[in-house]
Amino acid sequence: MKSIERYKNLGDDGKMDLLDDFSGNPSVEFLNYLEGELFSIDVDEFVKVEILKFLSRFRHDNRETKDKIVKLIVESYLDNEEMTLSIAAQELMFFDLGKDDFRQISDLLLDKEYQNMDMVDLTSSLIRLLCTKNRGGSSDEYFQELEKIDSYREDIKI
């Protein structure tokens, strides 16, 4: 609990420094608190980036954390800066993704409203994530759908 109180009392720069320089093992309560911060509209985008890096460093093997990061991307993309979401997609490289994750990411990329938003950096990060995590062809079916969209075709390397 000491880390949560200390964290809350810091300004944005202090929070980023604390997360970047953190040594030791953070408490479960602190990690859970940080996960909640990802969905707050009051948290600065640069702080969210440090939270994402922190979580991928200390919780890369936690399914619930991975699910929350995927949720941040696919359900909260309208409420967050593209930079934050692109970093979230990049940090997912450190987590194990399953078929459901591939489906959610693919569905977002196929969504017409999302495509009209022209989020180039996020789209590139998501396609790179799918390509990198495509071990054993587990996401080939999603690539077939995505290849039908002209703007995605060149980015997809099967």
Residue ranges of model-derived segments:
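Charge-rich, low-complexity amphipathic helices
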Residues: 1, 52, 56, 73, ...
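Generic L/I/V-rich hydrophobic alpha-helical segments across diverse proteins
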Residues: 31, 124-126, 143, 149, ...
